[in-house]
Structures are given as structure tokens and as C-alpha cells.
Amino acid sequence: MKRVLLLQVMLMLFVTGCAQSPIGEFDFADGVVQHAVPADEMSWKACPPNLPSGCEIAVLEGDPRAPGLFTVRFRLSEDFVMPPHTHPRDERVTVLQGQMAVAFGANGTRDGAKEFGAGDYYVNARGAIHTVWASKSSEIQITGVGPWEAHFID
């Protein structure tokens, strides 16, 4: 009876310990209690060459190329189109300004796309083929778990 109880307690502690993940914990330096990125101090850069032209990126937290939590912002020109693609992990998007449209499927069309405006939030499921359009100059914020990848559909 004691062995069964001990095993149950150990199993409960193991499961509880596994359910707690440090993925959302920020790596603060000693004595630092907040990470802030004021809008006027964001470091905007051209998007990587594997992404379509017409976008800039600012990394707010983490590294989207490495394992772990990250948050980035994208500035998109009004004619920006992200062709059909997938991501290996869920993609969490907040539209900060402008207008975005998302269509699903390898042949998704702009006419069949769902529209999102400033203040809207959506999550695209991992593995779902989708195309993204900016209807006007836009800024979006993406939070996810890296490494973040976009696999384009030929």
C-alpha cells in the first residue's frame, strides 16, 4: 500500500513538473525586472531574403531562428503578398495597424480571404496552407515558439 501511494505521489509530481514549462520565462540579467522596447527605439531591418519584398522586421523578444518564445513585428507595404505557405508551429498574429487578409488552401484567393483590421488577433494553425495580403500599409506582431519557419508551397 505504501509503495502504491509513493508511486502515485511520484507520478503526480512528475506530471505536474512536466506541465510547467520555462518557455515563457524571460532571461533577465541580475537586478533587471522588466524588458521594454519603446516604439521609437525599435530596430527595424529588411526582412530576410527568403520573405517577399515589401516588409521590415523588428525583433522585440527572443530569436525567431532559435528554440524558445519570440515576439516580432512586421511592417508591410500595401502591396505585400506572402504566397501560399505553412509553418511547423501555430502562428499568433495581432494586427496593430492597417488591414490584413488571410486565405487558406494552396489556391486561396484574395476574394475569399478573411479580413483583419487594427486590434484584431488570430491564430493560424500549424501546417495550414495560407496566403496573406496587406490591403494597405500595415504593422503586425507575431508571437510564437521558435525556430519560426515559413515553408512555401510551389
List where the protein language model places each region.
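C-terminal motif of bacterial Sec signal peptides marking the signal peptidase cleavage site
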Residues: V15-G17
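Short acidic-glycine-tyrosine-enriched beta hairpin
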Residues: A106-G127
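Glycine- and acidic-residue-biased ligand/ion/polar-headgroup-sensing regions
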Residues: S77-F80, T86-N107
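Double-stranded beta-helix
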Residues: V33-H35, D111-K114, T131-D154
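A short, N-terminal "cap"/entry segment at the start of jelly-roll beta-barrel domains
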Residues: S21-F70, K114
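Short beta-strand His + acidic residue motifs that chelate non-heme Fe in jelly-roll/DSBH
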Residues: M82-P84, V102-A103, N124-A125, I129-S135
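N-terminal post-signal-peptidase region of extra-cytosolic proteins
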Residues: E56-L60, V72-F80, P84
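Bacterial N-terminal signal peptides that target proteins for export
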Residues: M1-L7
